[in-house]
Amino acid sequence: MDVCHTDPAELSSGEAKELQQIKWHRKQLLEDIQKLKDEIADVFAQIDCFESTEESRMAQKEKEMCIGRKKFNMDPNKGIQYLIEHKLLTSDVQDIAQFLYKGDGLNKTAIGTYLGEKDPINLQVLQAFVDCHEFANLNLVQALRQFLWSFRLPGEAQKIDRMMEAFAARYCLCNPGVFRSTDTCYVLSFSVIMLNTGLHNPNVRDRPPFERFVTMNRGINSGSDLPEEQLRNLFDSIKSEPFSIPEDDGGDLTHTFFNPDREGWLLKLGGRVKTWKRRWFILTDNCLYYFEFTTDKEPRGIIPLENLSVQKVEDPKKPFCLELYNPSCRGQKIKACKTDGDGKVVEGKHESYRISAANAEERDQWIEAIRASITRVPFYDLLSARKKKIVGK
């Protein structure tokens, strides 16, 4: 098909003017189209940049959150402070409590340590944390399983008392009418925890029968007895399935370290070449266990406290020392065991154990706890005091 090209010289002045306008509009349209293309390209570039920046920001926040969790697991108070400073957590107690309750990436021991502190903010967080639990229509053992799974119960009696007091109040609020008072719930909770130890701790030879459990809890319901059927259900539940705590805080040693009398960092003198090494110590069931790290599932060493004594000692290289020794067999090796470099369990070679605390107060607290562990069973003091309170009403 032939295209006819018009010679401008053949156009009238009006037609020539109209043609010029058409060309001008065409040029304007092409320029507008190019501007739109440039603007679209710029928008896409900004979107790409924004997505990249957002991804980078999210990656940075995730990195900071990971750091915060690690800091929390090493030092709970510093970890919370770091998360607040980096705006990953607010200072509101409800926000902190939810963070601990969800527990993503958090060590249960560290959660228990934070909740056990006596500072006003920690006490408020403890209350908010307990309120995160819904115990409605659960029997006491079911509620305890849920509660004790969410953190590791610390070893100090005062901390245990505060936590179990808060638990008892929350359980009674969720289940009105089950017990006449929170004291009843408190005492029975301790009885159940001690029953768990009696039935499932391999170190306990005398397994408590149901009748002993009933006798132990006579008169705790504001002077009256609890229904035997209720006690039977709790007893059977614990007998068939012991309490468990998260893998990162117990492993196969769940029952052993479930409720330590005391735990913390100390320096221990040992090795062929005598050196001081930092170890995490746990005092429970008349034994002193020490670990290289708080997250270790197996101890580096076990020191049975039977027939041993503890005393303050002076050391030329370390202050605030205590010593474990056998008063009737001075010079003989203490019966203990440790894990060697190959992972084998070998007999200890110590005639005494020398341990250094951070300060005099901490040393004295350890000495008191060790002496108490040698002579009495954990929980009995708290339980006895609360029973006296109930009887006195």
UniProtKB/Swiss-Prot annotation:
Q: Which UniProt keywords apply?
A: Cell membrane, Coiled coil, Guanine-nucleotide releasing factor, Lipid-binding, Membrane
GO CC terms of this entry: cell junction; centriolar satellite; cytosol; intercellular bridge; plasma membrane
Can the keyword Coiled coil be found in this entry's annotation?
A: yes
GO biological process terms held by the UniProt record: regulation of ARF protein signal transduction
UniProt-annotated location(s): Cell membrane
Give residue ranges for domain SEC7.
Answer: 54-241
| Alphabetical list of InterPro entries matching this protein | PH-like_dom_sf (IPR011993), PH_domain (IPR001849), Sec7_C_sf (IPR023394), Sec7_dom (IPR000904), Sec7_dom_sf (IPR035999)
List, for all copies, the residue spans of the domain called PH. Answer: 259-375
The entry marks the following residues as binding a 1,2-diacyl-sn-glycero-3-phospho-(1D-myo-inositol-3,4,5-trisphosphate), namely 268-275, 279, 290, 300
Coiled-coil region list: 13-56
What are the boundaries of the signal sequence? none
UniProt KW Membrane keyword: yes
Record PROSITE patterns = PH_DOMAIN, SEC7
Cite the residue spans of the region called C-terminal autoinhibitory region: 386-393
User: Its topology with respect to the membrane?
Assistant: Peripheral membrane protein
Q: Which GO terms describe its molecular function?
A: guanyl-nucleotide exchange factor activity; lipid binding
Q: What does this protein do?
A: Promotes guanine-nucleotide exchange on ARF1 and ARF5. Promotes the activation of ARF factors through replacement of GDP with GTP.
Q: Any notes on this protein's domains?
A: Binds via its PH domain to the inositol head group of phosphatidylinositol 3,4,5-trisphosphate.
The name under which this protein is listed is Cytohesin-4
Provenance organism: Mus musculus
